[in-house]
């Protein structure tokens, strides 16, 4: 954080990485082929979402299921959370089994293009939709930030299918193209699309895309994990700097550590006592 006075002579200089000891480094997304990233970004721009099938193996899905299922307990406090929907918050404080979802290279490669450097993890939850759950109220994830539309997205979300997503078991319902809307809200005439995908697949969508959890009219649960991300100058939904111990922060990947808030948005956003927060982990 300590920069030579002569290196900062314009306001533009303040928007650069001023850290000396903890310089910004590329994310794991840099390993993804550029053509693949460009195709993903074109789909995001057109539709507001992209589906990647079979990123996780059946064994990886079963491992996640085995770890998180014992923690499933109470259902939602209101109809938005879901009266028949179980949620596990602060997953990172409990297990490392979902880390590979948070920092998957395909995800980071898109976020590197969509958001500013040192973007943050906003939430990581396991969500289990039980039989009999009704459809969730349509919403867009960055609508909780009071900045009028139309605008560029302030956030993005991934939803990972740990169980198969079907049109009947609570698959997330998207409104393609709604990320470009202005102030208007969905109407019954708008086209909606359930994200039908096999277990191990992931849908990523921008924070301005209208969507909601689908109704589960089957006799089986539908388990998913969602990781959400936001611009580095916004307040995340989950206060990870409070819920994640420094011991855990030391043990996760560099990318996850950065997304937990052990990073700086230039020039000083996120500093601790005027210094880079990574010093707390030394």
Go through each PLM region and give its residues:
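Catalytic core of non-heme Fe(II) oxygenases with the double-stranded beta-helix
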Residues: 133-197, 234-244
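A short, structural micro-pattern
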Residues: 120, 152-154, 219-221
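Aromatic-acidic/polar surface patches that form glycan- and anion
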Residues: 57, 100, 151, 195-196, ...
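Conserved double-stranded beta-helix
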Residues: 2-3, 181-204, 208-209, 214-282
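Non-heme Fe(II)-dependent double-stranded beta-helix
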Residues: 2-47, 53-148
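A conserved hydrophobic position in a structured secondary element of the catalytic/binding core
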Residues: 93, 102-103, 175, 205, ...
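Catalytic palm active-site di-aspartate
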Residues: 48-49, 200
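A structural signal for short, well-ordered beta-strand segments
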Residues: 123-126, 158-160, 225-229
């Amino acid at each position: 954080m300590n920069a030579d006075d002569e290196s900062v002579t314009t306001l533009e200089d303040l928007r650069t990485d001023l850290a000396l000891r903890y310089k910004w480094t590329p994310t794991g997304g840099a390993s993804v082929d550029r053509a693949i990233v460009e195709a993903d970004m074109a789909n995001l721009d057109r539709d507001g979402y992209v589906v990647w099938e079979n990123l996780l193996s059946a064994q990886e899905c079963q491992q996640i299921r085995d770890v998180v299922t014992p923690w499933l307990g109470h259902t939602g406090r209101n109809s938005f959370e879901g009266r028949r929907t179980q949620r596990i918050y602060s997953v990172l404080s409990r297990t490392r089994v979902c880390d590979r979802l948070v920092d998957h290279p395909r995800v980071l490669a898109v976020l590197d293009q969509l958001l500013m450097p040192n973007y943050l993890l906003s939430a990581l939850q396991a969500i289990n939709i039980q039989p009999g759950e009704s459809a969730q109220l349509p919403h867009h994830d960055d609508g909780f930030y009071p900045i009028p539309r139309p605008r560029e997205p302030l956030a993005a979300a991934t939803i990972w299918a740990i169980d198969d997503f079907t049109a009947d078991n609570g698959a997330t319902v998207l409104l393609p193209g709604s990320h470009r809307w202005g102030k208007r809200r969905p109407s019954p005439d708008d086209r909606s699309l359930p994200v039908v995908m096999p277990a191990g697949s992931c849908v990523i969508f921008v924070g301005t895309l209208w969507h909601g959890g689908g109704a589960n009219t089957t006799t089986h649960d539908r388990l998913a994990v969602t990781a959400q991300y936001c611009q580095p100058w916004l307040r995340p939904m989950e206060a990870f700097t409070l819920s994640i111990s420094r011991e855990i922060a030391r043990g996760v990947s560099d990318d996850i550590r950065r997304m937990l808030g052990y990073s700086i948005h230039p020039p000083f956003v996120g500093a601790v006592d005027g210094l880079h927060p990574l010093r707390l982990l030394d």
